Amino acid sequence: GFLYRHGFIEGFGHLSARLAPDRFMIARHSLGAHAKPEDFVILDLEGRKLEGAGDPPAEAAIHVAVFKARPDVNSVVHYHGMYSTAFTTSEQALRPIHLMGTLFHDGIPVYPDVKLVRDPVRGAELAKVLGPHRAVLMRGHGATLTGPSVEDCIAATFLFEENAQRALLSATLGRPQWIDEQTAAEAGAELIKGRGPFRRVWAMVEAEHEQAAQR
C-alpha cells in the first residue's frame, strides 16, 4: 500500500517478488491499495499461473521477462509515474539531480514502444533495453524498477520518482543543474554501499503500516 498512498501506482501498476529461481508472486489484476497475501498469484517464468485465484495483471509479461533476463533481480515494480513519465515525452533525458537520484547514475534507458507489454516479445524487448540498469522508463507509459529484494525495489521506486519530481521543479526555475557523471557515480556508490536510503524508505513503509493498523 505504500506506493499507492504516495500516488506512484494508483490504479495502474504492480509489484512482484521472486520466490524461487523459476517462479514469482504478483498481485492480481483487480487489486487496489489493500493487497493481502491471499490476493497474489504465483507464476512461472513462462507466465503460466501455478497457484492462486484470479488472473495476474495484463502486463505480467514485464515481470516474467525481467526475472528471466536478470537472475540478480528478486523484485520488480511497474508503475505510471506522474513525474518520471514526463521525461519520456520530451527531449530532456532524466538524470540524477538530487543525491538520492545518484542511485541511478549508471543510466536510465527509455523503452520506445508506448503500447502495453502484454506478450513475451515485448517483454523481452523491454528487458533488453533495461539491460543491467536499476530502472527503465517506458515512453508515454511509465517505468519499471528492479531490486535484489522487495524492500530495495520499493525504496528505489520511491527515490526514482522523487528525483524526477525534483528535476521538474528545478526546470521551472531555469536550466536544471544535473549532477555530473563522475560525482554521481561516486555518490551513488557510497549510498549503495552504506544502504542508508533503502533502510530509511523501508522504515517509512513500516511506520505507515503500523499507523494504518492502529486505525
Please provide the spans of the model-predicted regions.
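Glycine-rich flexible loops
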Residues: G1-R215
